[in-house]
Structures are given as C-alpha cells and as structure tokens.
Design a protein with these regions (language model features):
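Glycine-rich phosphate-binding P-loop
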Residues: 63-80
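Charged, amphipathic alpha-helical linker segments immediately N-terminal to NTP-binding catalytic cores
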Residues: 1-42
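Conserved nucleotide-sensing/catalytic segment adjacent to the nucleotide-binding pocket
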Residues: 28-37, 86-148
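Conserved nucleotide-binding/hydrolysis micro-motifs of P-loop NTPases
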Residues: 69, 96-99, 125-128, 137, ...
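Pre-Walker A adenine-sensing motif
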Residues: 46-53
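NTP-dependent small-molecule kinase module
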Residues: 208-213, 217-278
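Post-Walker A helix-loop "phosphate-sensing" segment adjacent to the P-loop in P-loop NTPases
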Residues: 81-90, 253
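A glycine- and Lys/Arg-enriched "phosphate-lid" helix/loop adjacent to the NTP-binding pocket
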Residues: 28, 132-150, 158-210, 257-264, ...
Length: 278
C-alpha cells in the first residue's frame, strides 16, 4: 500500500494515539537495509521539487507537529538536503509577538504560506493554537474550541488557491523522548538545545495526547490530510515523510512548461557561436 494512504488519517476518524505504534518500521530490517530506498526517494523528491517550481501553477505547504524531541528539525534537515533552497523555505512559529497577538491567530500563518512554485515547511504551525493554547489555558475553551472549524476553512481557502497541504504528526513514545533528552545531555553539539521547558512540557504529556487526538480527528480533511508518522526510529520517519511527499507530488501529474523561445532559432545561434568560437 502506498504510504500516502497508509499513514493518512481518514476524514471523520476518531484518532487514538495509544493504538498506533511509534516504533513501527513496516517491513524494513533496520536503517542500513533502508538506506538505498531512502536515497531513491530523496533523489525523486529533488526532481519533483524542480518540476513544481518550473510548472509554477501550484505550491506545497508541509506542516510538522510533534512533542519536544519528536524530530521536527531532523525531518526538515533531511528534506532540505533533497531540495533546491531557491524554491524552498522553512518557517518556525514560536511564541507570538505583540503585533501578532493584536491580529487573529491565523494572520501570521497566512503571511508565511508559499507562493506558486514554492515549497514551505512549517516547524510547528497554526495547530499550536489548539494545542499549547488548550493545554496551558492560554485562551478559554470557548475560544480554542472554535478554532478547528476556522482552521479547516483557512486550509480550504489555501487549497482553492492551489496550495497543496500535507500535515505530519511525528509520533514518538514517552520513553523515546526521554532517550533523546539524555542524548542531548551527552552530546556537546546538542546541549544548546536543552531547555528546562522541555521537562516542564513533558509533565503535560497526558494533556497533550487528547489535544493532538482532537486536532488530528477534526482537521484531517480530503483536501488537507493529516499523516501520523511512527517516529521512534529516525530513519523510518525520514523514509516515510519523503515517500509520502513523493507519492503525493507524483499524483499531481505535473509537466514542464513549453519553451518560451524558438528552439530552432536558438539551435542556429548555438551552432553559429560554436563555429566561430564565441
């Protein structure tokens, strides 16, 4: 089965994260066994991004959500290694500024969406406004509970204007999160990532789980689906995300635009330049 279907949250589904194994690796027998397949998808992703850029009629928005140490940065690094930075950008959404808070919660999001021909990757996204806002009571329930429908309407508008949306929840276990926190402590190159807030947020694990489940359940639509990616194994996470993006883009059946010049004339110019050495 194609991954674009296998890990997709069907619209109307009631998600239970405890029923989804974050350590799942499909049939793959470890990282080394999957290296060739991963590289094949990376190369194909590079080709498809060039085609998206040249085609110029559509854009692609990729939203990444995860709990702390879930692998958002690693996934972005893996994808960017496959793409031409000329047509790709990454936007991270942290605590809103005073200016952003003076607008509606989607204002800063809309400004960051991709132009036609571009790929934009959101490191966290508008879903923080139904996740952290809910868990930490940043706004009352009567406010955040209305945001699911507003998010769906917002994404529907983007799709109507030819922005295709893929949303990935990188699903890790609580044990794996703690292992990654330990790895950061042990690696001087990663110690800069350490924050006391990580451990504070970890204490809200049982509150984040239902918040994610409701967002995944209510906001996975036919036109803007969520994908739940088993992410305890970083290599499988990278494989699954790359494969889904490739399968999705291939389904768009994009084509290179026709040349805008007279090729016969250009060929004559070329042969003339070659003949005369200039």
């Amino acid at each position: 089965m194609k991954y674009v279907k296998r890990f997709r949250v069907p619209p109307g589904t009631s998600v239970e994260l405890k029923s989804i194994d974050p350590g799942f690796t499909d049939h793959h027998d470890g990282h080394q066994a999957a290296v060739k397949e991963i590289e094949q998808y990376r190369e194909r992703l590079r080709e498809l991004q060039e085609l998206l850029y040249a085609d110029g009629r559509r854009s692609l928005l990729i939203c990444l959500q995860a709990l702390d140490a879930g692998g958002k940065d690693g996934t972005i690094s893996h994808m960017l290694g496959s793409m031409n930075p000329q047509g790709c950008k990454v936007v991270g959404f942290k605590q809103p500024s005073a200016v952003e808070l003076s607008h509606d919660f989607l204002w800063r999001i809309h400004r960051a969406t991709p132009a036609r021909g571009e790929v934009t990757i959101f490191n966290r996204s508008h879903y923080e406004d139904v996740l952290i806002a809910r868990v930490h009571n940043l706004v009352p329930k009567e406010v955040w509970s209305t945001r699911y429908d507003r998010i769906n309407a917002f994404e529907s508008g983007l799709v109507h204007d030819d922005t295709h949306i893929l949303k990935f929840f990188l699903h890790i276990s609580k044990d794996e999160q703690l292992k990654r926190f330990k790895a950061r402590l042990d690696d001087p190159a990663k110690q800069w990532k350490i924050s006391e807030a990580d451990y504070k947020e970890r204490s809200y694990w049982d509150q984040y789980t239902p918040a994610y489940e409701e967002a995944l359940s209510r906001c996975s639509t036919e036109q803007s689906p969520w994908y739940i990616i088993p992410s305890d194994h970083k290599w499988f996470r990278n494989l699954a995300v790359a494969r889904i993006v490739v399968e999705y883009l291939e389904g768009l059946k994009m084509t290179f635009p026709p040349p805008t010049v007279d090729l016969d004339h250009i060929r004559k110019e070329y042969h003339s330049a070659k003949k005369h050495g200039h």
